[in-house]
Amino acid sequence: PSKPNINLDAEVLTITKGYEISNSSGLSILTDSKYFGGSNEDITLVRNEINIPILRKDFMLDEYQIIESKSLGADIILLIAACLSKEEVKNLSRFAKSFNLQVILEIHSEDEIAYLCDSIDVVGVNNRNLKKFETDINNSINLAGMIPSSFLKISESGISTSKEIFLLKEYGYDGFLIGENFMKNNDPVSACNDFIKEL
C-alpha cells in the first residue's frame, strides 16, 4: 500500500515458474486483494506447477485464514507482530504448526522480538518503516544480534543489490525476501535470474 501499482501486467504462472528456474528458494505470493491486488487463486494456480515452498503473504488475523492457507496449498504463513498481540502470535503459530505449516514472524522493532515463541520457525525483519514507508536495511543490521540464534533470520524489503545481501549475511541472515525490486522490472524473471547469478 506504500506505492502505486507496481506491475499490473504480471503473469503469475510465468513469473513463479521463472523464479523457480532461477533457483529461488521459495515464493512469496500476496493474497491480499484490498491493498496489494492479490488473490487466493494466485496460489492455487501455481501450487501444482512448482516444487519450491510457497509463503502466503497476507494479514493473518484468525484461525480460519490458517486453515484456508493449508487448503490453498501454502507451505508457510506470515504473522505480522505489528498487527497482533503476543498471545495471538503464540496461539496462531501453534495452530499453524498443527497443520504442518511453517511460520514466519515479521518484526519491525526491538520491542517485537518479545513476540517470539517456540512455534515460530523464522524471524523476518522488515526494513520498511510502517509509518513513513521508507526502507533501510540498517533495521536488519541493528536487530540481528538481538534475535536468538535458534531462529532462522531473513531480511525483508528494501534489498536491491547483491552487495546488500553479502553485508546482511555477515550479520547472520539466512535468507532474503525480495519482491518489489524484481516486480517493478518489465521482466521480473530476468531481473531475478541476473540478481541470483551475482551471489
Located regions from the model:
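Conserved N-terminal beta1-alpha1 strand-loop-helix module at the mouth
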Residues: 1-54, 61-64, 86, 95-122, ...
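Alpha-helical hinge/cap motifs
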Residues: 57-58, 73
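A short alpha/beta connector and helix-capping loop motif
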Residues: 66-83, 89, 93
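Residue-level signal for inorganic ion chemistry
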Residues: 69, 123, 179
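As written
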Residues: 74, 172-173
